[in-house]
Curated annotation (Swiss-Prot):
Molecular-function GO term, any one: POU domain binding
One Pfam assignment: PD-C2-AF1
Domain of life from the UniProt record: Eukaryota
Family, similarity comment: Belongs to the POU2AF family.
Protein's GO biological process: cellular response to virus; germinal center B cell differentiation; positive regulation of interleukin-6 production; positive regulation of transcription by RNA polymerase II
Quaternary structure note: Interacts with POU2F1/OCT1 and POU2F2/OCT2; the interaction increases POU2F1 and POU2F2 transactivation activity.
PTMs per UniProt: Ubiquitinated; mediated by SIAH1 or SIAH2 and leading to its subsequent proteasomal degradation.
Protein name: POU domain class 2-associating factor 1
Domain spans labelled OCA: 16-38
Organism, as annotated: Mus musculus (Mouse)
Primary location recorded for the protein, binned into one broad class: nucleus
Amino acid sequence: MLWQKSTAPEQAPAPPRPYQGVRVKEPVKELLRRKRGHTSVGAAGPPTAVVLPHQPLATYSTVGPSCLDMEVSASTVTEEGTLCAGWLSQPAPATLQPLAPWTPYTEYVSHEAVSCPYSTDMYVQPVCPSYTVVGPSSVLTYASPPLITNVTPRSTATPAVGPQLEGPEHQAPLTYFPWPQPLSTLPTSSLQYQPPAPTLSGPQFVQLPISIPEPVLQDMDDPRRAISSLTIDKLLLEEEESNTYELNHTLSVEGF
């Protein structure tokens, strides 16, 4: 059998362009949408076939008689269904037993049956300015029965003298612990205290006479007093005597 290449081959298609992506305004939302779409399609429908690009094959024309035209005896040809059945031996269909219902677990406790302590009403009780108790009514200290049972009412005969103290707005109840032994039955102290020393009758401080000498006024020669006591005549005479002395001294020097 001879094969002859056709003289007019078909024109080969252009190679596909590479995927360059798609411009979208919000890429994150687009990716999430595509991912959800792929997961829904993959879960619902059959897997899609992937087609890869391939080069086209050259076509050839037959010249001689084809070998497929030969007569084949009908006895040798078997049906496809019987041939496949002969290849694989199918097992006999087994009888299916009905599934028994599941037995419930004895120790299983329903979540709804469990009473959560925090699902009930919560109460807040301030204990002090920086501490507050939060919990159900069974946890908090204020309950229907009073906690302080042995409190006597205050007598109105003796009014309080001191100023009233302003307590906090929400004061927590105080628990009173009774003293088992009364104060009258307490034993007296065995220690004997010495009495204090008697005070001295006499004066404790001795007064000593101190004599302070008076300052003696000394008569000092004050030049101002001497000048004030002299008269003007005496002053003029003293000046003249001093002048004559100076003149006599100068004349004696020049005559020498």
